[in-house]
Regions:
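OB-fold/S1-family RNA-binding modules
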Residues: 43
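Bacterial Sec-dependent N-terminal signal peptides
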Residues: 1-24, 155, 159
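Outer-membrane beta-barrel transmembrane domain signature
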Residues: 23, 35-38, 47-54, 60-159
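Transmembrane beta-strand segments of Gram-negative outer membrane beta-barrel proteins
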Residues: 22-32
Length: 159
């Protein structure tokens, strides 16, 4: 858990270490479905001067009878489309959760141990002139039980 916290702090700290530019390099957004499984709040940082390679980290949840914490992390690449401020968003990520749920497998882990889902993603992203970003994506969940089709939708603020 300490590793995940340190990763989050390191990514967040880079926001304040780089100079200002006209391209907004940071996003904070809410996501339904997607990498956080049911819902999450995420921070994303573009690592290049223009849209391209980025990294993200978040905190989310999923629910069966109880709520379970998830920690999605990942990298993505934004491919610019002809339409202004439109991108194909392709990424690879992993989501840690406290327990594997029946939603993503046949049975609960009897030890109540942590569980990792690997989540590739492909989607469409749009940045508006008012520094709002939104995204829709296909984010299949790959784990020891197989591949589960999954979708995500995000909306947030660029800064």
């Amino acid at each position: 858990m300490r590793k995940y916290f340190l990763l989050f702090v390191a990514v967040f700290a880079t926001t304040f270490l780089f100079g200002q530019s006209s391209f907004k390099k940071s996003d904070i957004y809410l996501e339904a479905g997607g990498n956080g499984l049911f819902g999450s709040i995420n921070y994303e940082r573009q690592l290049t001067k223009r849209p391209g390679l980025g990294a993200r980290v978040g905190i989310g949840f999923y629910s069966e009878n109880n709520f379970y914490l998830t920690i999605p992390v990942g990298v993505n690449y934004l491919f610019k489309l002809k339409r202004e401020n439109s991108f194909i968003d392709a990424g690879l990520g992993a989501t840690w959760s406290r327990s594997d749920g029946k939603v993503f497998g046949n049975s609960k882990n009897p030890n109540g141990d942590h569980f990792v889902n690997f989540i590739p993603s492909i989607g469409y992203r749009r940045h508006t002139t008012k520094n709002v970003m939104w995204r829709v994506s296909f984010t299949p969940v790959a784990n020891k039980y197989g591949l589960i089709p999954w979708l995500g939708a995000s909306i947030g603020k660029r800064f």
